[in-house]
Curated annotation (Swiss-Prot):
The gene is gatC. Heterotrimer of A, B and C subunits. It comes from Fusobacterium nucleatum subsp. nucleatum (strain ATCC 25586 / DSM 15643 / BCRC 10681 / CIP 101130 / JCM 8532 / KCTC 2640 / LMG 13131 / VPI 4355). It comes from the Bacteria. This is Aspartyl/glutamyl-tRNA(Asn/Gln) amidotransferase subunit C. Coiled coil: none annotated. One of its GO terms (molecular function) is asparaginyl-tRNA synthase (glutamine-hydrolyzing) activity. Keywords: ATP-binding, Ligase, Nucleotide-binding, Protein biosynthesis. Gene3D superfamilies: Glu-tRNAGln amidotransferase C subunit, N-terminal domain. Allows the formation of correctly charged Asn-tRNA(Asn) or Gln-tRNA(Gln) through the transamidation of misacylated Asp-tRNA(Asn) or Glu-tRNA(Gln) in organisms which lack either or both of asparaginyl-tRNA or glutaminyl-tRNA synthetases. The reaction takes place in the presence of glutamine and ATP through an activated phospho-Asp-tRNA(Asn) or phospho-Glu-tRNA(Gln). Belongs to the GatC family.
Length: 96
């Protein structure tokens, strides 16, 4: 399955990226090469391979849960460029 130029443009738009025409052609070739490699990997017979859950025999070495006081809201908001109603204001990136 080869990606068309339009599909590469759609991926770029969804990723909030913009490219020049040369770059789009380059990415189209590179993405198609990646997809060919994935197709090649899909042809490998793995029916007799047991799924690998852990690479080594280690168990989780998490530290014990310890309740700690959180930062005061004033300290958190002190370095924020903009805040409102005890929250940090960030630029909208979804839906643009």
């Amino acid at each position: 399955m080869a990606l068309t130029r339009e599909e590469v443009l759609k991926i770029a738009k969804l990723s909030k990226l913009s490219f020049e025409d040369k770059e789009i052609e380059k990415f189209q070739v590179e993405l198609n090469d990646i997809l060919k490699y994935i197709d090649m990997l899909n042809e490998v017979d793995t029916s007799k391979v047991e799924p690998l859950v852990y690479i080594n025999e280690s168990v989780n070495n998490f530290r014990e849960k310890e309740e700690k006081p959180s930062l005061e809201i004033e300290k958190v908001l002190f370095n924020a460029p903009e805040s409102a109603e005890n929250a940090i204001v960030v630029p909208k990136v979804i839906g643009e």
